[in-house]
Every structure is written in structure tokens, then in C-alpha cells.
């Protein structure tokens, strides 16, 4: 089983914000694969299904971003999943808007949701897909990531969510190396 986690903050006021692009990626993946992500368990909205004949659990933690590790730790302990079968999708301000960076493992960088996950799982040895949301030229970083995409960036981000979904599907079916080669940008 693969655990596919999109990071974000719960609540309507955070819908469609840069920081919730991980949730949006899960929504797109769920739609493409006819999986309902509605069941509340393990402090997350979850949906079980298959991708390319492989069992997956799609997850949107409901703990707020900086505590995402609490939800994922619950899930990993319950399902006894190898960290290599976890995929985390999240926003990254250090990558240009619309760019994907897929890695097999690594540090959290500046992302507090990833810091929580790595700290509580006690490993950074799991795949992740960073979705570029760009960086503000000026102003407060928190306001920027909790803000929405401007109209002119929305088509780019919709296409990016489509590619992120395809990257996850490829990773589940064909492995991380194939996904990295095909979708890293």
C-alpha cells in the first residue's frame, strides 16, 4: 500500500491558498482515480482506492500544517507502512510557480509541515513532490503562502496539479526513478 499525503490547512478560509496546494493535488488525484476522500480517521480526511492496480490511501491531514506529522504517524503505525511507500505533496516557495521537484528522500527545507513529519516519523527517507508556488518579491511570507494565486497563475497551477497527479500515478505504478525522470522540472 502507498500512503499519498497532501499537506494543507483545514477550513474553508484556507481553500485554494498556496499553502494548500498539497490538498488540491490530493483532490485532483482522487478525481482522476475515482477515490472519495471523505472518511475522517487518524486526524485526517482519507480515501482508499487503487492506482494502476496498486492499493493507495489518499490523505489530507486535518491537524493544521505545522502538526501534519501527528496524523501521518498515526497512519504509518496503523497500516505498518514502509516509509518508502509514503509520498508527501506540498508547496515550496523556493521553486518557481508551476515547477515540480520530486525527490526520493531529503530534508524538510523551510517547510514546517515537513519538519513535523520528519521529526515524528524519525526519518526523512520517503519520497516527496514539492510543488513550486514562487516567493514574494516583497511583503510578509505568511501572507503570501496563505494568499490565493492571482488570476494569471491559475491556468499554470491547474496544469501543474495535473502533472503532480500523473507523477504520483507513475511513482505508484513504475517507481520513483521513472517519475523523477519524467516529471522533474
UniProtKB/Swiss-Prot annotation:
GO MF, any single term: tRNA binding
Residues the UniProt record annotates as site (Stabilizes the basic form of H active site to accept a proton): 91
Site residues by UniProt (Discriminates between blocked and unblocked aminoacyl-tRNA): 9
One Pfam family it belongs to: Pept_tRNA_hydro
CDD domains: PTH (cd00462)
Active site, UniProt feature: 19 (proton acceptor)
GO cellular component, one term: cytoplasm
UniProt-listed InterPro entries: Pept_tRNA_hydro, Pept_tRNA_hydro_CS, Pept_tRNA_hydro_sf
Top-level taxon of the source organism: Bacteria
Biological process annotations from GO: protein quality control for misfolded or incompletely synthesized proteins; rescue of stalled ribosome
Compartments in which it is found: Cytoplasm
Assigned keywords, A-Z: Cytoplasm, Hydrolase, RNA-binding, tRNA-binding
Known catalytic reactions: an N-acyl-L-alpha-aminoacyl-tRNA + H2O = an N-acyl-L-amino acid + a tRNA + H(+)
Residues involved in tRNA binding: 14, 64, 66, 112
Known EC number: 3.1.1.29
Function: Hydrolyzes ribosome-free peptidyl-tRNAs (with 1 or more amino acids incorporated), which drop off the ribosome during protein synthesis, or as a result of ribosome stalling.
Record-linked NCBIfam families: pth
Subunit note: Monomer.
Family: Belongs to the PTH family.
Record's protein name: Peptidyl-tRNA hydrolase
Organism this protein belongs to: Alkaliphilus oremlandii (strain OhILAs)
Lineage: Bacteria, Bacillati, Bacillota, Clostridia, Peptostreptococcales
Amino acid at each position: 500500500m502507498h500512503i499519498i499525503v497532501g499537506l494543507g490547512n483545514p477550513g474553508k478560509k484556507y481553500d485554494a491558498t498556496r499553502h494548500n496546494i498539497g490538498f488540491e493535488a490530493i483532490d485532483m488525484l482522487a478525481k482522476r482515480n475515482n477515490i472519495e476522500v471523505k472518511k475522517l480517521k487518524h486526524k485526517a480526511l482519507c480515501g482508499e482506492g487503487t492506482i494502476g492496480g496498486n492499493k493507495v490511501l489518499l490523505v489530507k491531514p486535518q491537524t493544521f500544517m505545522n502538526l501534519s506529522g501527528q496524523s501521518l504517524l498515526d497512519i504509518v503505525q496503523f497500516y505498518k507502512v514502509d516509509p518508502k511507500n509514503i509520498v508527501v505533496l506540498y508547496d515550496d516557495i523556493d521553486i518557481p510557480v508551476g515547477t515540480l521537484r520530486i525527490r526520493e528522500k531529503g530534508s524538510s527545507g523551510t517547510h514546517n509541515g515537513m519538519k513535523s513529519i520528519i521529526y515524528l516519523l524519525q526519518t526523512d527517507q520517503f519520497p516527496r513532490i514539492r510543488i513550486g508556488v514562487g516567493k514574494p518579491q516583497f511583503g510578509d511570507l505568511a501572507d503570501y503562502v496563505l494568499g490565493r494565486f492571482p488570476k494569471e497563475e491559475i491556468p499554470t497551477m491547474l496544469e501543474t496539479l495535473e502533472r503532480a497527479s500523473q507523477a504520483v500515478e507513475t511513482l505508484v505504478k513504475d517507481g520513483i526513478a521513472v517519475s523523477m525522470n519524467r516529471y522533474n522540472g
